[in-house]
Design a protein with these regions (language model features):
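Flexible "stalk/tail and boundary" regions
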Residues: 1-53, 58, 67-127
Length: 127
């Protein structure tokens, strides 16, 4: 599918986005919750009812829906922040403040990063 999925972030005034793989991952996470629990209904409704499936135009651009523009406080500029499996779109001023706080949190929780096993695919030795 030549497009992207976007939805308002739950944790900040930014826009979360990604491809079908992200949507599938979110769906699987919700499916692991109790089927008829109130929390499951609230989460799945909040996630999926506000998700936009947007196609790229002939120049590879998308147009953001007004509700996402308002949620992220976007005006003349936006910043795109890659985050591995997903990305975020921010008002640059809001992102600067978030980034400062994120660095502090990252230092506090750096022990959550587990060891990484290096492969020998590109001539890297494990020893």
């Amino acid at each position: 599918y030549p497009g992207v999925y976007l939805f308002p972030s739950f944790t900040s005034n930014s826009i979360d986005g990604g491809g079908m793989e992200l949507i599938n991952q979110i769906s699987k996470s919700v499916e692991r919750m109790q089927l008829f629990a109130e929390e499951t209904d609230a989460l799945s409704t909040s996630l999926f009812s506000d998700t936009y499936n947007l196609a790229y135009d002939q120049d590879g651009r998308i147009s953001l829906p007004e509700s996402l523009i308002v949620h992220a406080n976007l005006e003349n500029k936006a910043i795109f922040v890659g985050q591995g499996r997903k990305f975020q779109i921010w008002n640059p001023d809001d992102f600067d403040e978030f980034k400062k706080k994120a660095k502090i949190k990252a230092l506090e929780h750096r022990n959550l990063i587990g060891p990484v096993e290096l492969s020998n695919e590109k001539g890297m030795d494990k020893d």
